[in-house]
Amino acid sequence: MMSDHGGPGRAATNAWMSTTDKRRLPEIIGAGPGRTGTTWLHRVLEGHVDLPYGVKETQFFNTFYDKGIDWYAHHFRHATGKRKIVEICPYFFDPMTPERIRAHIPNCRIVTTLRDPVDHTFSAYKLVVHFAWARGSFDEVLKSRANFASDNRYATRLRTWFDLFGRENVLVTMYDELRAQPQSYLDRVTDFIGIERIELSARPEIGDDVHSFARAPRSPWLARRARRLMYWLQGRQAYGVSNLLERAGVWDFCYGGGEPFPPLTTEQEQRIREHYLPEVEALEELLGIDLSVWKKPQARRASAG
């Protein structure tokens, strides 16, 4: 039984509430959004918190919700209760996810990282082409995918997270800080999670590299089939097979090898920046911060990963 908002209805909620205490579910969810250093943060937190077993992102609350809460809890079966349980997964923009998390983990705390809307839009474009969700030029994809117009509405989405979890339980960080001062950024996150600070100088293997996509796939047909296989394996929690294919370079071969992505033009950047200006100003008011840097032309479009 479903509520009007897509979350579990009262009867369904009561049915699993009696066993929820026997499950181990995340206390903290890093909700992204995507393309904001989530992979980097997951790597840094490994060994300091209990993360999902075998996979970085379960995508339970947006993609695999119909599999049920026990499917999700199975990812944390290794947790003993001695460490914080955390998932890093880009749920931020999904309209159904906040209420679903609230229904199952009412005391969950949320970490978000916000990025210049122009950079984020360009990075998202490269991602959807890389995984063959779309093909074409930046302008063609922007016109064909409705979610591009609604994504980056940070203030609108943040209000929902604040309303459901309480403003004090939602940490809002900035991607610019991660890139410029990764230690300072990480300190804020670990303090919020409630674990000892992690010194990046002691983890040279981590570095400050954030995963980016430089090229389109050599074959959209091949990339689509690789993506379907990846999701098929994930739905069955066959992460060992998926990870083996990754280590063997299969995913990189399927998703890469095509033409490099051209940088945004000045006209494209200006158009996107003007489109999101009201939302940026709303975010400034909501958070009480100055985001004037997001209102100016930037010289980093070609490297936006």
Task: Tell what function each PLM region has.
Residues 2-305:
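Anion-recognition interface
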